[in-house]
Amino acid sequence: MRLLVNILTLSFLATSAWAGDLADDVLAEINLARTAPQQYAQILASRTVGYRGVEGPGVVKEAIRFLEKQRPLPPLATSEGIRNGALAHVLDMGPSGRRGHKGSNGSQPWDRMARFGKWIGGAGENIDYGQRDARGTVVRLIVDDGVRGRGHRKNIFSRTFRVAGAAAGYHATYGGMCVINFAGGFVESTTRVASRTALPAGSL
């Protein structure tokens, strides 16, 4: 029994380590794309050689053209409260293998953020499944293959959004997931903190 507990503990710590690193790296990668879109166009081109996807190679060319024309934007500041809203969704959806922006209790991204502070000037959410590579995650969200309106790309390059928070973790269907939440501004609350012990699935 002690051996089983030790194995489970080590497994949890390993998952926490990669998840935390991935979330931080995704935000850094998003800020690189925002502040240096022309440079990121070259990165995207090198990462998508031979890409077919849902819409075919044209979707990559369209994303590259977008980046080449995009004006640099300020980097997103990070927010602990927004991160906690993202983490709440990871902990809710990951174990069940469900996907989407609606939580198991019907909550939307702005509802989850609002439990850890007050968001200002709009809010949004991006989710990526199955990647454990930050650059691969952000490239996929910018290409936004098969997504009508390119909503994930618009969130990344929104002039309205000034702060963000990300969380990653295990997903029963895809192996992993990463949630990135955005807001125009955020006033942090000091009363609630998201954690794997504090937030059982569906509690938010």
Each predicted region: which residue ranges?
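Positively charged n-region of N-terminal signal peptides that target proteins for export
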Residues: 1-4
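Bacterial N-terminal signal peptides
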Residues: 6-15
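Short, well-ordered surface patches within globular domains
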Residues: 20-116, 153, 159
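Intrinsically disordered, low-complexity segments enriched in small/polar and acidic residues
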Residues: 28, 178, 183, 190-202
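A well-ordered secondary-structure block
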Residues: 83-187
